[in-house]
């Protein structure tokens, strides 16, 4: 099982995607699901457009790190290269959220001409606690979450296309941007392809039957901040090791996901998977610190 997991985790998505054992919803059922959410979400989204704490079309890039300086440096190098080639047409703020890495990482980050804010937690709070606090300090209408062991490997603009989807489809709360051959899991429920007015094609992921999976998740995602704030509080707890069934990854993704997924759906843009997790390093040392 472990070897299969390792192989799967290092496989990149194909074009067209490998849908494997995923289930496709018939168009009539999919329409019922997304129309209901559009009606429910539209007033929430329109209210957020005039919220003075949300700067319209601004993206807050939140980078979570924990004791992996080399991986973080690699990620930042790839982001710098990407933004040097693809100039964003939207306003950005870049926030580093560090979980107790110590002075070496923080001193390096301060010397980098890259971060607009650095949140340096003196101890490891755990991912759910750290991200919950960091999100409250963002001012963008959208949040792009990247974890320190990812890289960006893409040669086209995509941020503007994400905003286009958000502006035109009120059912979409989050866009998943990870390049991994993970679409074919048994619990994937996928809706028919849709398109924006500028021709950006995307599939919609529907919550799994248990309500926990397929939509809300961590790492390499861009989401509406209002989709987060309107879904209640991210549950927090002790920073248990991953062997504990209630570690913070479960709280963040599955427990909060049950609430988030009631109102919001996820988009996967066709041939737009900018972020890769090389999986060439040890598991984050932050679990159970």
Predicted regions span which residues?
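Conserved donor-nucleotide/metal-binding helix-loop-beta segment in metal-dependent transferases, i.e.
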Residues: 154-174
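C-terminal catalytic/acceptor-binding lobe
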Residues: 74-75, 202-203, 213-289
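A conserved acidic beta->alpha catalytic loop
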Residues: 96-106
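Conserved donor nucleotide-binding strand/loop of the catalytic core
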Residues: 110-125
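Glycine-rich, basic loop-to-helix element that forms the pyrophosphate-binding segment
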Residues: 122-138
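Short aromatic/hydrophobic "clamp" motif used to bind/position activated sugar donors
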Residues: 143
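Short, well-formed alpha-helical segments that are part of the catalytic scaffolds
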Residues: 68-83
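Short beta-strand-to-loop element that shapes/binds the nucleotide-sugar donor at the catalytic cleft/hinge
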Residues: 173-189
């Amino acid at each position: 099982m472990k070897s299969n997991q390792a192989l799967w985790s290092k496989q990149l998505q194909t074009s067209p995607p490998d849908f494997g054992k995923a289930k496709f919803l018939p168009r009539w059922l999919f329409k019922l699901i997304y129309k209901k959410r559009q009606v429910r979400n539209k007033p929430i989204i329109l209210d957020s457009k005039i919220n003075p704490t949300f700067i319209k079309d601004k993206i807050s890039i939140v980078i979570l790190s924990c004791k992996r300086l080399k991986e973080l440096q690699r990620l930042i190098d790839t982001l710098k290269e990407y933004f040097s080639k693809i100039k964003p047409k939207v306003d950005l703020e870049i926030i580093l959220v560090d979980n107790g890495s110590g002075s070496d990482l923080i001193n390096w980050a301060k010397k980098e001409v890259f971060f607009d804010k650095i949140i340096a937690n003196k101890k490891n709070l755990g991912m759910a606690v750290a991200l919950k606090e960091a999100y409250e300090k963002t001012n963008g209408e959208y949040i792009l979450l990247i974890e320190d062991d990812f890289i960006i490997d893409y040669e086209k603009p995509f941020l503007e296309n994400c905003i286009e989807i958000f502006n035109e489809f009120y059912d979409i709360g989050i866009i998943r941007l990870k390049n991994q051959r993970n679409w074919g899991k048994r619990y994937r429920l996928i809706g028919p392809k849709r398109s924006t007015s500028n021709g950006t094609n995307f599939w919609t992921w529907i919550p799994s039957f248990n309500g926990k999976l397929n939509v809300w998740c961590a790492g390499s995602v861009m989401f509406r901040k209002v989709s987060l704030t309107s879904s209640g509080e991210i549950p927090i707890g002790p920073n248990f090791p991953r062997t504990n069934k209630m570690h913070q990854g479960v709280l963040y993704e599955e427990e909060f996901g049950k609430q988030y997924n009631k109102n919001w759906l996820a988009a996967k843009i066709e041939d737009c998977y900018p972020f890769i997790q090389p999986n060439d390093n040890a598991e984050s040392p932050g679990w159970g610190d």
